[in-house]
UniProtKB/Swiss-Prot annotation:
Top-rank taxon: Bacteria
Compartment(s) where it occurs, according to its Swiss-Prot or TrEMBL record: Cell membrane
The protein, known as: UPF0391 membrane protein RPD_2934
Paired cysteines (S-S): none
Main location, first listed in the record: membrane
Signal peptide: none
Entries under Pfam families matching the protein: DUF1328
Transmembrane intervals: 6-26, 35-55
Entry similarity comment: Belongs to the UPF0391 family.
Keywords: Cell membrane, Membrane, Transmembrane, Transmembrane helix
Amino acid sequence: MTILKWALIFLVISVVAGIFGFTGVSAASADLARILFYIFAAIFIVLLILGFTIFRA
């Protein structure tokens, strides 16, 4: 898999975690989902930058 495909996968994961975290599903899962959202959003941004710079085919 290319690095940009991984970046898109982490984007989808972060959006799903954001939906569960920011819509108020429950207090316990909302905190975990918010943390996961920020982690996967950061991974997405890093992989996106790497995909357009270092890992360009």
